[in-house]
């Protein structure tokens, strides 16, 4: 883990200051967990819940709250399993492309 990565994680932790402890834990889990090329955490909710010591229902409910607040977004769906990734908002990425005048 580079110094830049540590700084980004600290900034993410600071940005989640208004959230509940469980919500922050879910956001940080998605920030720190290995991802696929698209940034998705390819792991079931039950396995992720076990990693942070939550029951699966509490984890799923908390993750739903985090999704609704815009911190996570659905990345992939395989059969009935949905995979999520941090949203551009969480990563501090500006996805709005400035308009330019037509020539």
Residue ranges and their predicted role:
Residues 22, 33-91:
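Winged helix-turn-helix DNA-binding recognition segment
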Residues 88-103:
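Conserved segment of winged-helix/HTH DNA-binding domains
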Residues 1-51, 81, 99-103:
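Short recognition helix of helix-turn-helix/winged-helix DNA-binding domains
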């Amino acid at each position: 883990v580079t110094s830049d990565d540590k700084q980004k994680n600290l900034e993410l932790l600071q940005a989640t200051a208004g959230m509940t402890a469980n919500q922050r834990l879910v956001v940080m889990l998605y920030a720190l967990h290995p991802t696929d090329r698209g940034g998705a955490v390819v792991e079931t909710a039950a396995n992720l819940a076990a990693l942070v010591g939550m029951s699966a229902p509490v984890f799923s409910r908390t993750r739903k709250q985090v999704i609704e607040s815009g911190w996570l977004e659905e990345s992939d769906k395989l059969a009935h399993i949905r995979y999520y990734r941090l949203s551009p908002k969480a990563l501090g990425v500006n996805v709005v492309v400035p308009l330019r005048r037509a020539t």
